[in-house]
Every structure is written in structure tokens, then in C-alpha cells.
């Protein structure tokens, strides 16, 4: 246990409820580390299935997971890391009709998606509900990370009012 966290801090981590949206190259290690840290409740949302091409960059999945939903693969791996975690696997495409219900009641949302349409959808719902948002993006050897909606701070849309032009990354 990290000395600056202590028992009190670990209890707070165990009580935390986190949503991870996107279980690919970024979401895979995020989920692994949340589980290893002892986060008590993790909800993973992704509509996709594991493909052979995913395996080099999506470390949560293996060859036995090909053609399985990414969220089902993630649930199996998390239960091997920490059987006491409450893990909800949600295989669906998020849109305006379901995003709010999926994040309501959670302490933190981590956006591991790969497009600005999804990022704005997630951001807007988090801002509306006052839920902190950690945004991460990776592309090849480049990446970005940011924290939004924290203690009344700015949101993703405040920082990026419109999506970047096509071809710019991440």
C-alpha cells in the first residue's frame, strides 16, 4: 500500500464507482490499473468485439477472447485481478438516449474513446451531472490526457469548442 494513501485512502478507493467508456488500447490498461488499485465498482462500456488485430495494443484481451465482446473479456480479467470488485459489462453504443442513465450515480467517468463525437457526448453528460471526467486519447506514438468538470472547473467542450480538423490527432 502506498504510504500516502493509507488505510483510510484505500477505503475511499474501494468505495469509488468509476465508468470506463471504451475498452480498447487505452481502456484496457485503465481497467487493469483500476482493478489492481482496488476500485470497488467499475462499469465498462463498449459496443465492440475483440479482433485479432486488437491484440498487439489491447493488453486486456488474448487470443481466446477473439470475437467476444470486449466488455466480457474485461470482466473475466478483472475478476482474476480482484474477485471482490463489482464489475458491470455494458455492450452498447452510447448516444443521447442512454448516456445519462449509464453514468448517473458514478464518481468518475474515464473517456477512452477514439472520436470527438463520442467525447462531446460523454463530456456533455458529465458536465450536466457534475461528474468529473478524465479524458484520454492515444494515436500511435502520441497521446493526450485531461481532467474536466473537477470542482466546477472547465469541461472538455470549454477547452475544445469544436473538433479538430480531420487528420489531426489524437
Segments predicted by a language model, with ranges:
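Adenine nucleotide-associated cytosolic modules
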Residues: 1-170
